[in-house]
């Protein structure tokens, strides 16, 4: 699975799957984890910065143990 990490306005977002190049056709999942909030958001966050792969892997390990998000992430 492709996992990318971004930061915007003090929030950390992880993007699972998809490609940023074609924002009209590709829907990706963004997870905001700074405040324990996890949710889906559109894929037009073009100004976000890439963060470390290590941090992205940490989030994936955390989410894959959650029953609900295991099914959600498995689609990607």
Feature names for model-found ranges:
Residues 11-73:
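Acidic, low-complexity, intrinsically disordered interaction modules
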